[in-house]
Structures are given as structure tokens and as C-alpha cells.
Amino acid sequence: MNVNQVDLETVCGVTSVLPENTQPEFAFAGKSNVGKSSLINGLMNRKSFARTSSQPGKTQTINFYHLNEKLYFVDLPGYGYAKVSSELKAKWGKMIEKYLRTSTQLKVIFLLIDIRHEPSANDKDMYEWIVHNGFEPVIIATKLDKINRSQRDKHIKMVRTGLCAGANTKILPFSSLSKEGKDDIWRCIEQFLEVPDTENK
């Protein structure tokens, strides 16, 4: 998809009222510093529209990006950051769960996992929550450029096994440097749009 227009339309904090959007939403979840903002920027063909940071826990809001006036990317706060207080973690958790349970337009929850490491306990909990609530789990294995090409299959298997994911669960590797995997992610997104977009990506 050619992303010609992007607007950061809504930013929701822990006390905010969630928007009632009328177009498809695609949420991105993952632990802090897994490369969520870099992925979103890569998919939107923007260098720094979604704020990236070397400091885990930077994203503390739910950010709604409106693309081409036809769909939304929803950037969820990263989980598992040790330096965030327990009280704030609880508030984030409630905020995220409220969105995921109440959105009427949410089509897919993309769960980002660092391909270099086995899924954490928080990753496993999030995956189980996605499945339990009836969503089709789609895993994006980030930081693909950090491992050798010969190690890819081994690490993808490690992610699948660590999550206890079935053979049919999609695991889409992605590199924020080369953008390898970007087209596969867009094809997945387009399957859930009412009119699949066949423009060149």
C-alpha cells in the first residue's frame, strides 16, 4: 500500500475516553523496546512519525494513526518495563484491556516478539489473551537483521514453541533496517480490509 497520508488522530492516556472509530483498526502490542515504533514507521513509510526511543517504556499512551483516511494503526504501550511503577503498570493494563475488549473495529492484534530471544512470560500472557478473546494471532518477529540468515528458521521455531503456537499461526519476520517482511505484513493487513488494496507497496 502506498501510504500518502498519515495523521496522529487520537492519543489516549489512562483517563482518556477511547475513540469510536468507524474504520478498521490494527493494533500493535509487544514488550518495551521490541521495535514497535520502528515497525509502524516502516509500514507507514515514515522515518520518525511514530516516536522511537532507546529508553524502554517511552510509549505511555494508546496512539491512533489514521492512514489514507481508510484504516488505523493503534500503537499500544509496551509492557514488561521494570522501572515503571506497579500502579502505573496496572493502569496501563486496564487501559489496554479496555481498548482491546471494547473496540468494534479491531481486526488484528499484531504481537511483536524479538526474534533473538525466547518469548517472555509477558509475551506468553499476551498471546494467550489474544487467543482467548477470539482474535487470530499474528506474530511479527522483529529485529531480523540482528541474526544470521542461516539462523532464521531456528529462531522462528523457538518463537513458535515458546508461545505454544500452532503450525497455522502466522509468524512474519521483519527488519526495521532493510524493511524485509514489510510486504508480507501489508498483505496480511489487506486481507482484513473491505476492499483489498493492490497498489504497489
UniProtKB/Swiss-Prot annotation:
Residues 22-195 form the EngB-type G domain. Its cofactor is Mg(2+). GO terms for biological process: division septum assembly. Gene3D superfamilies: P-loop containing nucleotide triphosphate hydrolases. Coiled coil: none annotated. This is Probable GTP-binding protein EngB. Keywords: Cell cycle, Cell division, GTP-binding, Magnesium, Metal-binding, Nucleotide-binding, Septation. InterPro entries: G_ENGB_dom, GTP-bd, GTP-bd_ribosome_bio_YsxC, P-loop_NTPase. Necessary for normal cell division and for the maintenance of normal septation. It comes from Lachnoclostridium phytofermentans (strain ATCC 700394 / DSM 18823 / ISDg) (Clostridium phytofermentans). GO terms for cellular component: cytosol. GTP binds at residues 30-37, 57-61, 75-78, 142-145, 174-176. Mg(2+) binds at residues 37, 59. Pfam families: MMR_HSR1. GO terms for molecular function: GTP binding; metal ion binding. Belongs to the TRAFAC class TrmE-Era-EngA-EngB-Septin-like GTPase superfamily. EngB GTPase family.
